[in-house]
């Protein structure tokens, strides 16, 4: 799926996850 969508769901779905962590996981 789209990386931005992945980051969005990561940020709202996992407490304490930073944008950088989500971006790393999603790319």
From Swiss-Prot:
**Has UniProt tagged this entry with the keyword Cytoplasm?**
no
Alphabetic keyword roster: Disulfide bond, Secreted, Toxin
Subcellular location field: Secreted
Q: In which tissues or organs does this protein occur?
A: Expressed by the venom duct.
Keyword check for Cell inner membrane, yes or no: no
One GO CC term, this protein:
extracellular region
GO MF terms, alphabetically ordered = toxin activity
Q: List the cysteine pairs that form cystine.
A: 6-26, 10-22
- Which domain of life, per UniProt? Eukaryota
Show the domain comment: The cysteine framework is XIV (C-C-C-C).
Q: Which family does it belong to?
A: Belongs to the conotoxin R superfamily.
Protein name per the record: Conotoxin flf14b
Q: Which organism is it from?
A: Conus anabathrum floridanus (Florida cone)
